[in-house]
Curated annotation (Swiss-Prot):
Disease linked to the protein: Retinitis pigmentosa 36: A retinal dystrophy belonging to the group of pigmentary retinopathies. Retinitis pigmentosa is characterized by retinal pigment deposits visible on fundus examination and primary loss of rod photoreceptor cells followed by secondary loss of cone photoreceptors. Patients typically have night vision blindness and loss of midperipheral visual field. As their condition progresses, they lose their far peripheral visual field and eventually central vision as well.
Gene: PRCD
GO molecular function, one term: opsin binding
Top-rank lineage group of the source organism: Eukaryota
Name the record gives this protein: Photoreceptor disk component PRCD
């Protein structure tokens, strides 16, 4: 009985974490995509500019 309750509680915690993680990234993906694209473009452009100078 104790083992069964432990397994069920563990599975419940894992499922809660998975569903919570899936719900949160959806709105943050929109913000992160806009921020990430601008941040990704800056290092790439600066890296490309440094290579021809060398």
């Amino acid at each position: 009985m104790c083992t069964t309750l432990f397994l069920l509680s563990t599975l419940a915690m894992l499922w809660r974490r998975r569903f919570a993680n899936r719900v949160q990234p959806e709105p943050s993906d929109v913000d992160g995509a806009a921020r990430g694209s601008s941040l990704d473009a800056d290092p790439q452009s600066s890296g490309r500019e440094k290579e021809p100078l060398k």
